[in-house]
Amino acid sequence: IHPNIDTPIADGIANTLDYLAHHWQDQPSLEHLAARAGWSLSHFQRAFTEHVGVSPKRVLQFLTIAHARDRLQDGASLLDTALDSGLSGPGRLHNLFVAIEAMTPGEYKTHGAALTITYGCAQSLFGPVLLGVTPRGICWLAFAKPDVSEAAEAEFHIEWALSQRIRDDRAVQPILDHALDHWRGHGTTSGLG
């Protein structure tokens, strides 16, 4: 949360984040979250997004997918993972994985077997990053400072050990640039996971 915001707004956002951390499996609606904060829907969405940096829906998606990834890594079925993650079924789980991870839950569960991931180093505002990209968008992003770049790349290869990995630094830079433009509000969402 931005350090220079009014206390009532900061308190409302902090309370919402705490609520989401404890009730994400209920998949609360934006309307429910705004009502809990005592704000109008539009004010809540705008204030939350401005001060947190992402929308309440995106925070909920991140919390949900973190749990779903853990369940899949533990060997749970797609149906059990979806239901245990507060989703209505495997279709919602599929959509969430494609939107956030740029791959299906099945591809994630198998560490990318039958998946081609193009990866490489690209330059960002925060320094070099190691970027992994599937045909659906970005699936991996790790800061790759000189002292940790080998470790970041080793972790990438372990995570996606069963995928076909193709190193192409020149191919990933425009994808990162496009993503950064989108995140700054200057681009479209095509090609982004």
Please tell me what each predicted stretch does.
Residues I1-S85, G91-G193:
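Basic nucleic-acid-binding alpha-helical/helix-turn surface characteristic of O6-alkylguanine DNA
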